[in-house]
Structure formats: structure tokens, C-alpha cells
């Protein structure tokens, strides 16, 4: 999500979780 890019420190962590969930 774009709102995650706002906070890389947390976005990277959440992005990883979302990526695992989507795949």
C-alpha cells in the first residue's frame, strides 16, 4: 500500500508481512 511508503521503518516490516500473505 502507498500509505506504508510514508514510514519505511514500519512499512518495510508490514510490507514483508503483506507480501507473504498475498503470495
Curated annotation (Swiss-Prot):
Purpose of the protein: Major toxin that belongs to the bicyclic heptapeptides called phallotoxins. Although structurally related to amatoxins, phallotoxins have a different mode of action, which is the stabilization of F-actin. Phallotoxins are poisonous when administered parenterally, but not orally because of poor absorption.
Key words, A-Z: Thioether bond, Toxin
Source organism of this protein record: Amanita phalloides
GO molecular function: toxin activity
Entry PTM: Processed by the macrocyclase-peptidase enzyme POPB to yield a toxic cyclic heptapeptide. POPB first removes 10 residues from the N-terminus. Conformational trapping of the remaining peptide forces the enzyme to release this intermediate rather than proceed to macrocyclization. The enzyme rebinds the remaining peptide in a different conformation and catalyzes macrocyclization of the N-terminal 7 residues.
InterPro entries: Amanitin/phalloidin (IPR027582)
Protein's name according to its UniProt entry: Phallacidin proprotein 1
Domain of life of the organism encoding this protein: Eukaryota
Residues in cross-link Cyclopeptide (Ala-Pro): 2-8
Cross-link (2'-cysteinyl-6'-hydroxytryptophan sulfoxide (Trp-Cys)): 3-7
Propeptide: 1, 9-23
Amino acid at each position: 500500500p502507498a500509505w506504508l511508503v510514508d514510514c519505511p521503518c514500519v512499512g518495510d516490516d508490514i510490507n514483508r508481512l503483506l507480501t507473504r500473505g498475498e503470495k
